[in-house]
Amino acid sequence: MSKKPVMLMILDGFGIAPKSEGNAVTLAKKPNLDKLFEKYPTSQLQASGLAVGLPEGQMGNSEVGHLNIGSGRIVYQELTRITKAIADGDFFENESLKLAMTNAKKTGSSLHLMGLLSDGGVHSHIEHLRGLLEFAKKEEVQNVYVHAFMDGRDVPPSSGQEFIEKTEKMMAEVGVGKIATVSGRYYAMDRDNRWERVELAYNALVLGKGETASSATQAIEKSYHDNKTDEFVLPTVVTENGNPTANIKNGDSVIFFNFRPDRAREITRAINDKEFAGFKRETLDLTFVTMTQYDKTLERVNVAYTPQTLSNTLGEYVSNKGLNQLRIAETEKYAHVTFFFNGGVEKENPGEDRKVIPSPKVATYDLKPEMSAYEVTDELLNRLDSDKYDMVILNFANPDMVGHTGVVEAAVKAIETVDECVGKIADKILEKNGCLFITADHGNAETMIDFSTGNPYTAHTTHEVPFVWVANDTEGKKLSNGKLADIAPTMLVQLGLEVPTEMTGENLIVNK
């Protein structure tokens, strides 16, 4: 018997904004999306700030977006959780953080604070570094070193100097800390098993080897001189009298202050895992603390803020009702439609199939804006013909990953590629008398020029995202505006299921 699948398609980084020369969404020729937006009920969803459990005015991101969509409720984000703990003072009583402080103090070893130096709020926040410096001062830790990972993606591409200055000022005010290394996130925060990049960051952090500079400021200046923006700063060791200021040694304490897991795992494994095989290196004996749980299977790490458990997420609930579901994406967004969508749970639910299509191996995605969208589409169409699935969750990575490059023409091509794929998928779902919801997790590709400077804008945005309901039975109905947390309840109603009490989102389908 033919199933009537209820499908959610997430166009990653596809926000709503007025037409402009920096809006790849409106510049793109997208006949399929235009037709669907015109013919079927559409509304707008909030995907940033308080509506997704982030601080007010904070841009959304993929992790947060998928958590909110998949759980059907506003999820209190780690950024907000940690910021609140610092403000309340609970932060300074955190047992795992205290463990790192005590070890460094008791043994006279060093305390290393490593993480993304930015106020982007996607992977980290510079105010959390301030909290750690204040904690170290309070605990009278003498040798405190900062290993700065430079951003340039969630903040402007060349804003690194400003964050270095901010950190230097912060350390002077608090009275503790020195910057020991500077590395672009391209190296220190890879998530695609490109161990040759990670190794360069590791060498700077642990061996004190790599590019050298007499100060963090000089490291950034040197990088800009070589036309490398923050993200691509080669791992650089800051020296004093020709020697490394500090490197991570046996017996030291390390606190990794990134709170988002996906780009923190590889360097953490490289430093800690005994069985690590990415490249040759010594295993150190450290007191290593991660701000949040990066991965349950990580060895020899302490977690400062353990995960909040979310029950009755969309995937779990549908599984408990005996329905089959498919999660499909390419590598770059696979964790988002699985781990994050399931509320931070790695294991799949019974009846949940997963398919990852490898992302292309290119240095930056403007070189191949199609990414693996066609392959994802072909795989999905084949699977829809199996009539196995009641629910399908798909993510197209293109608008976000190409949007991050700042190359408008490439982002336009990315969206045109996705539009072709949308057309084929919508036809197939309608043919099966199913229903397709199209949305995004946050904005990005709709704002690619910073008009105050004329420079490329590579970060996410606070714009609303579209919500479209494509089905054969939409006559006389419309969609209300809402937030990402309203998607799951809306889908459950289409699946003919009750909405569980844990889901505080609302069904957005209303009669006209």
From Swiss-Prot:
Keyword Manganese recorded: yes
InterPro entries hit by this protein: Alkaline_phosphatase_core_sf, BPG-indep_PGM_N, Metalloenzyme, PGAM_B_sf, Pgm_bpd_ind
GO cellular component, one term: cytosol
Required cofactor(s): Mn(2+)
Entry note: cofactor: Binds 2 manganese ions per subunit.
GO MF annotation, one: phosphoglycerate mutase activity
Binding site for Mn(2+) 2: 12, 62, 441-442
Reactions catalysed: (2R)-2-phosphoglycerate = (2R)-3-phosphoglycerate
SUPFAM superfamilies on file: 2,3-Bisphosphoglycerate-independent phosphoglycerate mutase, substrate-binding domain, Alkaline phosphatase-like
Active site location: 62 (phosphoserine intermediate)
Alphabetical UniProt keywords: Glycolysis, Isomerase, Manganese, Metal-binding
Swiss-Prot/TrEMBL GO biological process terms: glucose catabolic process; glycolytic process
Domain of life: Bacteria
Pfam families: iPGM_N, Metalloenzyme
Annotated binding of Mn(2+) 1, by residue: 400, 404, 460
EC number: 5.4.2.12
Coiled-coil positions: none
Residues noted as binding substrate in the record, renumbered to the chain: 123, 153-154, 185, 191, 260-263, 333
Pathway: Carbohydrate degradation; glycolysis; pyruvate from D-glyceraldehyde 3-phosphate: step 3/5
Oligomeric form and interacting partners: Monomer.
Family: Belongs to the BPG-independent phosphoglycerate mutase family.
Job description of the protein: Catalyzes the interconversion of 2-phosphoglycerate and 3-phosphoglycerate.
Name of the protein this chain belongs to: 2,3-bisphosphoglycerate-independent phosphoglycerate mutase
Protein source organism: Clostridium beijerinckii (strain ATCC 51743 / NCIMB 8052) (Clostridium acetobutylicum)
